[in-house]
Structures are given as C-alpha cells and as structure tokens.
Amino acid sequence: MNIIDLRSDTFTQPTDAMREAMAGAEVGDDVFEEDPSVKKLEQLAANKMGKEAALFVPSGTMGNLVSVLTQCNRGDEVLLGDQSHIFLNEVGGIAALGGIHPRTLPNQKDGTLDLDALDKAVRSKNLHCPPTRLICLENTHNYCQGTPLTPAYMENVAKLAARHSLKIHLDGARIFNAAIALKTDGRELAQE
C-alpha cells in the first residue's frame, strides 16, 4: 500500500530515478567551483528566476540565514510576519548568529502583512531602537494555508521599502507553488 504523507513537503522522498541520477552525477571540487553539477544547478536556478547568479546551499534555513546576514549588520532590525518560517522554525538563527533583531507583525490570513502597520513599524531615526533594514516575506506562506503573495502585493511592499530605503528578502522555498497558483513564473514573483 502506498501512503501519501501531506503533513509537509519536507516528507518527500527521492524516486529511484532521482537516486540513480545523484549516484551517476559528475562531481568536482566545490571549493574551487569545479563541481559541474552544482554549477549547472546554480545556472538553472538563476535563469529560472531571472537573476545574474544563484548560490546552492543545502537547506532553506541556510538560504534564509545567508540572505538576511548579507543584507543586515549586527544590531539591525528585520520586520517579518509572526507566522513566518524564519521566525518560527529557524532556531532564531538571525538573532543568534547575526545579532539581528526580529520584529514581528501579525500575518493576515492570506500571508500578507498589513501595509499600514508595516509602514508604521519602520524605525530608522530613533537611537534607542535598532534601525529597520529589511522586510522579510514568504511566498507561498506555509503557516497561512500555503497562500501565494500576488505580484501586486509584492509591488506595494517594494514601493514601501523604497520609500524607507529598506531591502526585501523573499523566503521563496515554495515560490514555484506560488507561480503555479498565480499562473505566472518565478521571475515575476522575484522582481527587484
């Protein structure tokens, strides 16, 4: 009997064909950027997302951590949803490893953050508070029933971020799910 476990996409298992492909893959030294499989995967990801380059990391948690640490300094603040994966399921990595202050706002049922609340939450000039540097979003939003963030919403957040000279990080672990649900592609959902 085949059992389908729908608790999380993390329960997926590779097929026999996938295992064979991994076992037969050409490998090289990753330190010297000589692993052709990784280079090909990174180029494929960059092309699918319309980006100049991509970086392979072994987990979504590491991808989020690298991205947030790249865009913030110790003592900076990140605004993110109270139901976001980064806040709930990534062992406080941005605070523990980066000294970055996570400040949560309530996620709406559709995974969005209220734009007025987000606008009011931005801090930059008060020397008693950590300066806000980054807004983190998640698409699709895992704890909000897998709802996708629309390009229109993302554009509104981008305009808000630009007004405050903030950066945006998109946790896109399920971005292709969002693209399918919205009948678009990853490029549109990851525009700068």
What residues fall within each predicted segment?
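Conserved PLP-enzyme active-site core in the AAT-like
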Residues: 1-192
